């Protein structure tokens, strides 16, 4: 008799994706982030569900309802901070996951990679809309600034902004629609994640040296299930340390002031995970140019398969490319730092140089270096 795990129409899908999946024997901890992202998504949907039970999407009561959750709802404070800091953990895992893909050449799985880029955009959109909901000062002004960027689009820009905001300014209509869209997007992300997984399972995982692992496969369970559980425990440990010891470390003090359309904060900045893109946006003095650079800074990921000139897939045996990769990481950290600084003398020029460096590294230096490495190896 066949095992029910392998014959049942639903169970065999789970079996082929998480139990009997043939996995390379040599994948490192950098391959843990996919499962961690899944855990983050489930955690965000669950905490979000409980928050939505007590939250009111109305300009008059939104701020008070969040305060009420923290003060009066049983364990409301921990649910709220797990949701807020869960987003930070989500983005840390996302950046690590994308960085792994860049380093080990995983972008040669085109469908998986492209769905991944769409997932990144969807997650950023969700985080942005969720950011507005507590209706604090920085939430309000951050959203006002970012939505107004759309007015830079020629011909339709101004109408588009008014259409998204549901009026001339951020108001009750905006808050309601952002809440609705923030509630539905995570489920679209979950559906996309399943597609991402289906395509990844179709080709099999990549591995550190970037070579075929068909000759040496091991079952996903128990080897990688136990490894993923360890990763999950470390993720939850990090999240709970943040939630219980420094819940506001990554937030902005301005958000403890209710939104006031008549009072602009001195330095408007988004959450830390958008700062690198915000720095690129600010470093270009032209509005439309800035918006284009902002979108391209993430959309450039789609070009990665086209920019791959090396005869080797992974960077494991390419020391010069490795140097450039880590320079790119340092550059992104610099941009993140600059995005949180005021627009004044030393920061402006540093931001502009870091932005130029970002595009130069990806579009010019890395492909050229790959060619040089091919020649050095006489390939």
From Swiss-Prot:
Keywords: Electron transport, Heme, Iron, Membrane, Metal-binding, Mitochondrion, Mitochondrion inner membrane, Respiratory chain, Transmembrane, Transmembrane helix, Transport, Ubiquinone. Heme b b566 binds at residues 97, 196. It is found in: Mitochondrion inner membrane. Binds 2 heme b groups non-covalently. It comes from the Eukaryota. Pfam families: Cytochrom_B_C, Cytochrome_B. The keyword Iron applies. Heme b b562 binds at residues 83, 182. Heme 1 (or BL or b562) is low-potential and absorbs at about 562 nm, and heme 2 (or BH or b566) is high-potential and absorbs at about 566 nm. The cytochrome bc1 complex contains 11 subunits: 3 respiratory subunits (MT-CYB, CYC1 and UQCRFS1), 2 core proteins (UQCRC1 and UQCRC2) and 6 low-molecular weight proteins (UQCRH/QCR6, UQCRB/QCR7, UQCRQ/QCR8, UQCR10/QCR9, UQCR11/QCR10 and a cleavage product of UQCRFS1). This cytochrome bc1 complex then forms a dimer. PANTHER family: CYTOCHROME B (PTHR19271:SF16). Belongs to the cytochrome b family. This is Cytochrome b. It comes from Litocranius walleri.
